[in-house]
UniProtKB/Swiss-Prot annotation:
UniProt-listed SUPFAM superfamilies: Composite domain of metallo-dependent hydrolases (SSF51338), Metallo-dependent hydrolases (SSF51556)
Lineage: Bacteria, Bacillati, Bacillota, Bacilli, Bacillales
Cited CDD domains: ATZ_TRZ_like (cd01298)
Residues that bind substrate: E95, R148, H188, E218, D304
Organism of origin: Shouchella clausii (strain KSM-K16)
Swiss-Prot/TrEMBL cofactor(s): Zn(2+)
Function: Catalyzes the deamination of 5-methylthioadenosine and S-adenosyl-L-homocysteine into 5-methylthioinosine and S-inosyl-L-homocysteine, respectively. Is also able to deaminate adenosine.
A molecular-function term among this protein's GO annotations: 5'-methylthioadenosine deaminase activity
Domain of life where this protein originates: Bacteria
Protein name: 5-methylthioadenosine/S-adenosylhomocysteine deaminase
Keyword Cytoplasm listed: no
């Protein structure tokens, strides 16, 4: 059925940066078939589902390119620690207690939070109960890139078992749910996967035609320890083993790198998921996004898990990313307002290798959100792009659509039972802490 959303301010995020102050969009079979200024013709609207946006702002759905929704019960569980202690002393021991019910509760909680704050697409890097989650994503109507991450600090036999699990999941779910679910392979990090194991995973990814996702250079300690063991930075080792070329890489973090490393990643069309709030909370440092951009790296945004953030609000992430770069570089135009919005939308689509996504254009997937501009912090309302980056909040989002199907309308979730999910999340955490 044709759907028309009319009476909206349409922020297209196309290359021309077109904004229709009073416009409408037409959606058929999950894609945009028209984006126009003014009102739809009476003939065109005949037989269509016409939605009056009532002057809301309509923009592409936000895209979260790095996270661990399975950890969402751990929100606020352990603060004020660096990454290494946070993981070893708190998170990993808690993860040993996770079972299917707890992980399901965590993930459903995350999907509620993401939809309510305008995220339509996300990446999940985790190792537990992925098939159940893929089915839940399909039912909830979201778009996702999912992967069974692997840690290689084990025997070669166990390494191969983990890789086989990862490949099996990737094959089962790649391009499923009407193309809304894609998969990757995911060595956890250079410090948890020996070089030979990463090489084996990359070889498998090349054979399967799958991208690879990995944590990279998140903390200074990680890099110092790695160089003590291998005599070089992990990016240099990847290059020495010819693992950067012929592989679609998406790296998370990339905080502790130098110009030569950015140059290598840019030369091999790698993408980076910048997670500024998580990096700040854990005291990991500030990634040099401006240097990444200079070398042609596609920089997108991720939240990491709520255990280290503590929210999944990409508006907060966008704002933090732009402001940090201006502050550390003492330059007000080094990451522009438009570039900040791009990181949360079209660059996210590129990083996850989703075609026809991330902008409001004819032929693009109809993943979009609407915000209520009738908020004091969004007025005067003439500078919408500036407000979206520097003032908007996830709570301003009122409507969320994926492939033209509504997941939330007028702040009401349509595919998830929020009341039940919140109750279950609290019950599961209490059970784990007993």
């Amino acid at each position: 059925m044709k759907t028309i959303i009319k009476n909206a301010k349409v922020i297209t995020m196309n290359e021309a940066r077109t904004i229709h102050e009073h416009g409408y969009v037409v959606i058929e079979d999950g894609v945009f078939t028209a984006i126009e200024h003014g009102e739809p013709a009476e003939e065109a609207a005949k037989g269509a589902n016409v939605v009056n946006a009532d002057k809301k702002w309509l923009m592409p759905g936000l895209i979260n390119t790095h996270g661990h929704t399975g950890m969402s019960l751990f929100r606020g569980v352990s603060d004020d620690l660096p990454l290494s202690k946070w993981l070893a002393e708190h998170i990993w021991p808690l993860e040993q207690k996770l079972d299917q019910k707890a992980v399901e509760a965590a993930r459903l909680l995350s999907m509620v939070e993401m939809i309510e704050s305008g995220t339509t697409t996300f990446l999940e890097m985790y190792h537990l109960h992925l098939d159940d989650f893929a089915a839940a994503v399909e039912e909830a109507g979201m778009r996702a890139t999912l992967m069974r991450s692997v840690i290689g600090l084990c025997s070669k036999e166990e390494q191969e078992e983990k890789l086989a699990e990862s490949l099996g999941f990737a094959r089962r779910w790649h391009k499923q749910a009407n193309g809304r679910i894609q998969t990757m392979l995911a060595p956890h990090a250079p410090y948890t996967c020996p070089p030979d194991y990463i090489e084996r995973i990359v070889e498998a990814a090349r054979q399967e035609g799958l991208p690879v996702h990995m944590h990279l250079a998140e903390t200074r300690k990680e890099i110092h320890d790695y160089m003590d063991e291998y005599g070089m930075h992990p990016v240099e080792l990847l290059q020495e083993r010819d693992l950067l070329s012929g592989t679609e890489w998406l790296f998370a973090h990339g905080v502790h790198m130098h110009e030569q490393h950015y140059e290598l990643l840019g030369a091999h069309q790698a993408a980076v998921s910048h997670n500024p709030k998580s990096n700040l909370k854990l005291g990991s440092g500030i990634a040099q996004v401006a240097s990444m951009q200079k070398h042609g790296i596609v920089v997108s945004l991720g939240t990491d898990s709520v255990a280290s953030n503590n929210a999944l609000d990409l508006f907060e992430e966008m704002r933090t990313a732009v402001l940090l770069q201006r502050g550390i570089n003492e330059q007000a135009d080094i990451v522009t307002t438009w570039e900040g919005l791009n990181m949360a939308t079209s660059n996210g689509a590129k990083a996850l290798r989703f075609a026809n996504l991330g902008t409001i254009e004819v032929g693009q997937q109809a993943d979009f959100i609407m915000l209520n501009p009738e908020q004091a912090h969004l007025h005067p309302s003439s500078q919408a792009v500036s407000h979206l980056v520097f003032a908007a909040k996830g709570s301003d989002v009122t409507d969320v659509y994926v492939q033209g199907a509504p997941l939330m309308k007028d702040k009401q979730l349509l595919t998830l039972d929020k009341e039940r999910i919140l109750k279950e999340a609290n019950e599961q955490l209490r059970r784990l802490q007993q």
